[in-house]
Regions:
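Membrane-interacting alpha-helical segments
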Residues: 58-75, 172-198, 240-244, 250
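A cross-kingdom marker for long, charged
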Residues: 187-191, 195-250
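Sec-dependent signal peptide recognition
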Residues: 2-7
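N-terminal Sec/ER secretory leader and immediately downstream segment
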Residues: 19-116
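N-terminal signal peptide c-region/cleavage motif recognized by signal peptidases
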Residues: 13-17
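Surface-exposed patches in mature extracellular/periplasmic domains of secreted proteins
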Residues: 37-38, 89-94, 104-107, 151-154, ...
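Extended amphipathic alpha-helical interaction segments
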Residues: 112-206
Length: 250
């Protein structure tokens, strides 16, 4: 009985520390900033529909997508999933708080800024690299869930009009049929992202030295790195909630 009491006491004392680690990890890994960059892209997508839709339909689209991707709600869903999926956040937190981790996050945030996206709207420049650097990038391409996360972001932005129409005209997109179309789009986007993924990673992490890039790949391929990136992908999916009705989101 004493051992059980001690175990429960230890769990009570440890849980707030782990929760605090998760909050710190969420910020250190750049999640709030990336969500802000996503909202910038969402606003740009809304503007593209302004002149092609009737005013009432356009306003419904804006209202619906703003509700769906409300910042606090996206953060809440993503953080809850990260908390549920990542058993021990300490190793990932240590990495992202390190000088290299901060440099990785800075590179990723720079790549998703709206001015960078506008500059590269017609495609990224072809990056030349040594065979050794290409080898490390290949390892990173396998370790990072870039295809999957990129597909979710693309689907979320592209789906604002369809989601709004579905809310205005219930039953417009049948459940099973809609899910089948969504899965097909997801696979197609993952394939498209994968075709140029190595060059994309070379561009994003171009300011990392060869040694830093290798250290990053070592973390990403480690058990702790794999655990974090698997949890991160689940958190992206939970935060964006592609395929879920806006009315069903919490």
């Amino acid at each position: 009985m004493r051992r059980l009491f001690s175990l429960i006491l230890l769990m009570i004392c440890t849980m707030p520390v782990w929760a605090d680690n998760l909050d710190q990890l969420y910020k250190a890994a750049g999640w709030p900033d990336q969500r802000a960059h996503f909202n910038d892209a969402l606003t740009a997508a809304q503007e593209r529909y302004r002149n092609s839709l009737p005013p009432a339909v356009y306003q419904a689209l804006v209202n619906n997508s703003n509700q769906r991707f409300q910042a606090q709600a996206v953060d809440r869903r993503a953080q809850a999933q990260l908390r549920a999926t990542l058993a021990n956040p300490a190793p990932a937190l240590a990495f992202f708080q390190s000088p290299l981790g901060r440099k990785v996050v800075a590179a990723e945030l720079k790549a998703t800024r709206k001015d960078e996206l506008a500059k590269n709207a017609k495609g990224l420049p072809k990056i030349q690299a040594s065979d050794d650097r290409l080898l490390v990038i290949g390892h990173l391409a396998q370790a990072l869930p870039a295809r999957e996360a990129g597909a979710e972001v693309s689907l979320a932005i592209a789906g604002v009009a369809a989601d709004s129409l579905s809310s205005m005209i219930p039953g417009l997109f049948g459940g099973g049929q809609a899910q089948g179309l969504l899965d097909g789009q997801r696979q197609r986007l993952m394939g498209q992202i994968g075709e140029d993924l190595n060059n994309t990673l070379l561009y994003v992490y171009r300011d990392l030295s060869d040694a830093e890039l290798e250290e990053f790949a070592t973390f990403a391929e480690s058990p702790d790195g794999k655990a974090y990136y698997q949890a991160a992908l689940a958190a992206v999916r939970a935060g964006l909630a592609v395929g879920q009705s806006t009315n069903d989101l919490k």
